[in-house]
Amino acid sequence: MEPCDLLIHSATQLVTCAGPPGLRRGPAMRELGVIRDGAVAIRGSTIVAVGPGTDVRRRFRASHEIDARGRAVCPGLVDCHTHIVYAGDRVEEFEQRCAGATYQEIMAAGGGILRTMRLTRAATTTELVHAALPRLRQMLSFGTTTAEVKTGYGLERDAELRQLAAIALLDAAQPIELVPTFLAAHAVPPEFTGRADDYIDLVVESMLPLARDWYAVSSFAARAIPLFVDVFCERGAFDVAQSRRVLDAARSLGLPRKAHVDEFVELGGLAMALELGATSVDHLDVTGPSAFTALAASSTVAVLLPLVSLNLGLSHFAAARAMIDAGVAVALSTDANPGSAPSLSLPLTMAIACRYLRMLPAETLIATTVNAAYAIGRGGHVGALMPGMQADLLILAADDYRWLMYELGGMPVAQVIKRGQVVVTNE
């Protein structure tokens, strides 16, 4: 018999999400590779075998075993769009929205992103780390084992670089594997009011090269984890021409690209982002069906963020059903942030996607594992249970994976395993 460090066996459902390399589209988003009475063998941080329990247990002798009888086991979840490094909160603005104020009205009055900017600029790197750690612990308890984290609340050189430094420290301080994104073009800072082009000059000519230089000597680069560059292409933020400058500069620096597009208004940012080879385009709440063919023909992931529409009390959600049926590779994420989506729960995101985006439970799982991993450059490493992949798994407090989406606001995760180690036990 071969030795292994951990053997999880007797799973009522072993949901592998296994399949050929690459994004899942259309019917493939419903193929979960479920094994009844399944087992997973782990050596170090890597999966070495997946299959029927009798086969795997006959082959491996384990230092430690977990009996998953009566449980479903699935890949760790991937949250591919978050803004969790910031100072302060927006509790008062929440009440303003309850009284009828819109997101755009609050932002125009100096709130929203700009309020968080002021508090984040005043915070030290250590303070940002201490503020974000409890958020990451909560994400982990909900089953997130890999997460993208953006800057974008500094909106000036030093504060944006402090956010990058905080992300690196957070990556080393807790189990969730982080992927950094530089989002200096998140909003026009107040000192550049009426001069958005001048701010883009600063981002392109100074901030992006500094971010690239920071990344080159970072622990992320040493592990081949990418640094993405993102831009908020939206009315009241940056127009298509300004957004193009940011993404074009990122391409020139050899950095992969993302874009917030079509959240409130279709400006043409989606076509621009596809032209520039964006890894993902995020939000797409008002994207019309005429764009789906080009999106489906691309290698770009459509990252949908339904908690934003829910939290803002909007009547429309991204057209996920039509996108999937058209062959678009769809991912889901929390968009965890202090204003438009103050939630850290991917299971809640999946539950809302089933109810309001007309996605099937299996599709939401692929959208938060395989496709989400590709949306942040981690496809083939995390997001599925296959030999050679990182041993990131969830043992659910139920015998059916659909409890992840069925229960609204619950805690369906019994144990979280990251890189072969049990890091959370919720029971």
Swiss-Prot record:
Sites binding Fe(3+) sit at 81, 83, 260, 335
Q: Which residues make up the binding site for N-formimidoyl-L-glutamate?
A: 153, 337, 339
List the record's Gene Ontology CC terms alphabetically: cytoplasm
The reply on keyword DNA damage is no
Q: Which Pfam families match?
A: Amidohydro_1, HUTI_composite_bact
Q: What is the UniProt remark on how the cofactor binds and its stoichiometry?
A: Binds 1 zinc or iron ion per subunit.
What Gene3D superfamilies does the record point to? Metal-dependent hydrolases, Urease, subunit C, domain 1
Q: Which residues bind 4-imidazolone-5-propanoate?
A: 90, 153, 186, 263, 340
Enzyme Commission number(s) of this protein: 3.5.2.7
Q: Which CDD domains does this one have?
A: Imidazolone-5PH (cd01296)
Locations listed in the record: Cytoplasm
A GO MF label: imidazolonepropionase activity
At the top level, the lineage of the source is Bacteria
Main location group:
cytoplasm
Family indicated by similarity:
Belongs to the metallo-dependent hydrolases superfamily. HutI family.
The cross-references to HAMAP family, in alphabetical order and at most eight, read: HutI (MF_00372)
This protein is called Imidazolonepropionase
In which organism is this protein found?
Chloroflexus aggregans (strain MD-66 / DSM 9485)
